[in-house]
């Protein structure tokens, strides 16, 4: 294909759009939110991502919900949004996840979206029923509550725990910080725990401290800036999240934040 419209600018949609653009495919990226990776990073960082997309010729159509797909006689498809129309040889949907759990509706406790609530041993509220991965909740350590965070890392760990615990409960789930990272063009991005927007969606109050500084001293032959954002609880002063963006590989920094959240460290 020589042209494509990608609907959804989370991790999957953003990576697809990036790969299309670097291989010469004319790409349009559509999202109902006003910026890419909006559920993962603050605007300070996503502005850098948006600029990288535009530098590589990607048309950004943000703040637009898709209302229709229209097949054309020339084997193209037109994606119709609230604000415009985008025609390409293919349209790709990357709009998130929904648990496919109707089989157990009314039989086990679930979140409003259908995610099965599990205990420390991955068991649902009904005896003998276990759940893992994108069908199940995780225990989200930054909030101390059950949440729905469909990441492969969570799915792998939960699947292992089901295997260990299905006969006899022996190994408890430690919870998750939802640490993740992505490389888009020459930008390395990593995050762990809550962003300010994520906290607000959950009715929580947090503060943020941000810093942009070179990742190593100026006297080194090569260096490059790193944008760092630390999220913390103003009452307990506990670390609740961190975000990083740089042309240097800063993915390991998110692991440090993850450890700090898990251990209950404060900013002091």
Language-model features, listed with the residues they occupy:
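FAD-site-proximal beta/loop scaffold in flavoenzymes
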Residues: 1, 78, 85-161
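Helix-rich C-terminal "cap"/substrate-channel and partner-interaction subdomain
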Residues: 250, 257-268
